[in-house]
Amino acid sequence: MNQTDTTPAGTGSDGDDRAWRDVLARLTVPAPADLLDRVAARWSYVEGPVEDVFVAFTPEGIASVAPASSVDDDAEFTEAFRQYFGRPVLPASGAPDGVEEALRTGDATGLRFDLRGRTPFECDVLQATLTIPPGELRPYAWVAWQIDRPRAVRAVGSALGHNPVPLLIPCHRVIRSDGTVGDYGFGSPMKRRLLGAEGVDLDRVEATVRRGWVVVGDDRSGLVCMPTCHRSEGVPADHRHTFRTVGEAAGQGYTPCPDCRPMGG
């Protein structure tokens, strides 16, 4: 009995699309009309905060993001996607709704992500990281505390190192406890560029953290915040009070900020 060869010929963006459609056309039993979209992911090239980026997505959500400088061309991006996710990725006419705005504003909390293949721990880490606003920083320990795994700081770093959707899930906003930027999948210079584009003064952050991570209280609002929280940035000196811990601040009548959720709050 002869067996139909279902290996698609041809490479490249348009070639891949035609090749897979040819495979479906040769199937003995007619394929569902939407089978190609269910099997293959799609990719688009969009403007990013510091350079253009490749974005791959499925019906479930955004699956992969990569700065243009991290690959030679779209063929390298699509091949890397195929090897990592085990499925083809074909060109799309555009990115899903909301992606370009999320890259422009730095807020991707309204997007859906396809995180299949990530462990529950990794998904928890990514979900906590997604809540960090643009222009603000958190230490790895903060992420660990947010997911109720305060001792898993190194594991948090490893999970962020495997973030398939950087820039949108902003692992570049997570830094070391000493105030230095730390590692980044696309290199620390790219991490600095991204933070600089968000208005982060890394020299000031490092100088602040060298004195020890403190929380900042505002005696007008009664809130205590992380030092990089947007609420603490503009507190006048005569209303600004620093504490070593949230517990110490609570003893003075302060309430943890609902936005930055300082550790121990």
Range-by-range predicted roles:
Residues 167-175:
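Short Lys/Arg-enriched helix C-cap and helix-to-coil transition segments
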Residues 182:
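Aromatic, loop-rich ligand-recognition surfaces of beta-strand-rich domains
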Residues 1-151, 197-265:
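Basic nucleic-acid-binding alpha-helical/helix-turn surface characteristic of O6-alkylguanine DNA
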Residues 177-178, 188, 194, 250:
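A boundary/linker detector
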Residues 186-202:
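A short, Lys/Arg-enriched interface patch at domain edges and termini
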